[in-house]
Amino acid sequence: NDPIHRRVLDILPNRKKECLIQYYSYCKNRHSVEFVISDMYEPYLLVTQIMFPKAKYVVDRFHYITYIMDALDGIRIRQQKEYNEKSREYKLLKNKKNVSLLRKYSNDIDWWVYTKRYKNGHMVDVLPIDVLNEILTISQDLKEGYYLKEKFLDIIRHDEMMNVEEQFDNWINNCIEKNIPEFIEASKTIF
């Protein structure tokens, strides 16, 4: 891709290591490439090391975010399975709007706009903060997972990237300290 002109440069027949090496062998400036941005597909890392020896391999942040959201969803689903389908907790954890609220970055939520929700069989106006607080009281793991997700997004969305490595180290240590399996696994993808 050409990110500056926003256009696709080429599409390869497959993404196998051999095909990629052959394709990049025609690249004249490959020894002066400084960065390669990609997803976490292992052959991409290997091809980068072989074909762009001076380049730093940068994983697209979207892929990290996906791992973090999957970890949060994993906690939600694990907790949901502990409740009867008719219980309030199960319904709160299953509700698509609530799932969306959990996944959304808190800085992107308009906390003071009422939404209509069913509560105790009646349609009522509720604030997102009230819904979120009710969901997070269901499980300590879910609450801690939510705050780990928020901290992760704080780090990667911050304009100033000073001390980012230290921030990620602290975040990883926090994941390990909280001992939430889904986030321990997700934290292994960082660095």
Model-based region annotation:
Residues D2, R7, Y23-K54, V58, ...:
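Acidic/histidine-rich catalytic cores and adjacent linkers
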Residues L9-Y26, K81:
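Basic, low-complexity intrinsically disordered segments
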